[in-house]
């Protein structure tokens, strides 16, 4: 399936076949010989082979231990039903019948990595917390992960409660499994420096003595995020305490013909950069993906468009498979926004409502959201009327998407 800017997306889908799934009808991208619900046992980058294994290009030998035992009962002409029980292995979790790396390093026993490089990737804006950094860390191949997972970072402390070291903070990984350098020995994060100043937005706590903050000496209260400041202050060669990896909500399906709609706000772009580099950039996987991916990014200022050039270059190289659209809330207006008239992610999506609706109905399409919690209601704002126009109930439609594991959300 291709994405075209010059014609509706469904023109690029070819003849559509309506396929019944339960009590609802969905549009499939091509006529099918036999249709089943989307697979729930195939995760891109995961493995089921015991012994020496590779997680999305990061190889390691699994700890010796009992494996997962799966039993299946296949009714003639019916769907395969699987029942699996897993005996825990250190550093491994079974997710949908697949083994993925999991908590190889804990807060009590973190991996001692190091900073390879740090780059500020935003320009200054009127916001006090404008600075966002792309940080590459060396894990020596000891912390393998797959796209869509997270790692933890432990700052030296103290945190806002005076605890030393500070508590672990989880960050979505912004690199594909081989890492930005494709060595399988690095991991990248995109981190916003948290700064809260009384009188310039919300500021509940203060961890800077009044008058001592060099940037805001007159502020009554200033709070600087402990872990985000630690990461954004890193220099090449500095030590970093890493935990994880963890997380299974944002993993990609293994089907190379699956389609993805990615919705992100701010640093919620991280897991999608991980996925998109896997799909369109890395030597080990480039060219294998046959579906399409559509990225929507929402930010307050154009100076905050994270990895903007990277997405534009990717779109130019893969015009039929990848599309990139963004909403800049302080600079664009939308009549669809009845709250303040600003352009938010869902309002940008509404500009392509019918094209997106045809994709959302396709049982091969997965929807991913990462960032502000409001995106969930924004998704409903986009598609509830379209669902109901076809005689379905939105809550039931969404429940079906979740059951089919086509709806993936990490919001805060």
Regions found by a protein language model. Give the residues of each.
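Transmembrane alpha-helices of multi-pass eukaryotic membrane proteins
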Residues: 2-12, 56-67, 258-261
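N-terminal chloroplast transit peptides
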Residues: 2-54
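N-terminal organelle-targeting presequences
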Residues: 39-151, 160-162
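Reductase modules of NAD(P)H-dependent flavoproteins
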Residues: 88-93, 100, 105-111, 240-249, ...
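Ferredoxin-reductase
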Residues: 100-105, 112, 116-235
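Classical protein tyrosine phosphatase
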Residues: 143-166, 263-295
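Metal-dependent catalytic core segments for phosphate chemistry
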Residues: 187-233, 238-239, 274-277, 286, ...
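Transmitter module of two-component histidine kinases
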Residues: 196, 232-234, 246-264, 271, ...
């Amino acid at each position: 399936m291709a994405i075209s800017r010059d014609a509706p997306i469904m023109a690029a889908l070819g003849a559509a076949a309506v396929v019944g799934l339960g009590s609802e009808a969905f549009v499939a991208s091509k006529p099918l010989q036999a249709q089943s619900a989307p697979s729930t046992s195939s995760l891109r980058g995961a493995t089921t082979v015991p012994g020496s294994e590779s997680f999305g290009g990061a190889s390691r030998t699994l700890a010796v231990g009992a494996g997962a035992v799966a039993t299946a009962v296949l009714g003639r002409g019916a769907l395969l039903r699987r029942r699996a029980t897993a005996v825990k292995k250190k550093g491994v979790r079974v997710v949908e019948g697949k083994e993925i790396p999991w908590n190889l390093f804990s807060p009590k026993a973190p991996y001692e990595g190091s900073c390879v490089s740090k780059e500020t990737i935003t320009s200054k804006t009127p916001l006090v917390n404008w600075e966002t950094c792309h940080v590459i860390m060396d894990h020596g191949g000891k912390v393998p992960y797959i796209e869509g997972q997270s790692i933890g970072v432990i700052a030296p402390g103290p945190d806002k409660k005076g605890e030393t070291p500070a508590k672990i903070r989880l960050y979505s990984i912004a690199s594909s499994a081989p890492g930005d350098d494709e060595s399988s020995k690095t991991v990248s994060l995109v981190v916003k420096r948290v700064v809260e100043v009384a009188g310039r937005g919300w500021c509940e706590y203060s961890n800077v003595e009044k008058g001592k903050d060099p940037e805001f000496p007159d502020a009554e209260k200033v709070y600087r995020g402990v872990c985000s400041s630690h990461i954004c202050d890193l220099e090449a060669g500095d030590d970093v305490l890493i935990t994880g990896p963890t997380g299974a909500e944002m993993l990609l399906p293994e089907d190379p013909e699956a389609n993805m709609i990615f919705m992100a706000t701010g640093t919620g772009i991280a897991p999608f950069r991980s996925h998109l580099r896997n799909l369109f950039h890395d030597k080990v996987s480039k060219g294998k993906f046959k579906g399409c991916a559509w990225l929507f990014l929402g930010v307050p200022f154009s100076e905050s468009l994270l990895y903007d050039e990277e997405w534009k270059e990717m779109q130019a190289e893969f015009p039929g498979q990848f599309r990139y659209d963004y909403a800049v809330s302080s600079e664009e207006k939308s009549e669809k926004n009845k709250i303040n008239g600003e352009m938010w992610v869902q309002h940008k999506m509404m500009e392509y409502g019918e094209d997106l609706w045809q994709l959302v109905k396709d049982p091969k399409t997965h929807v991913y959201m990462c960032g502000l919690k409001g995106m969930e209601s924004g998704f409903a704002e986009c598609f509830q009327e379209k669902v109901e126009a076809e005689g379905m109930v939105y809550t039931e439609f969404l429940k079906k998407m979740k059951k089919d594991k086509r709806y993936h959300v990490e919001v805060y």
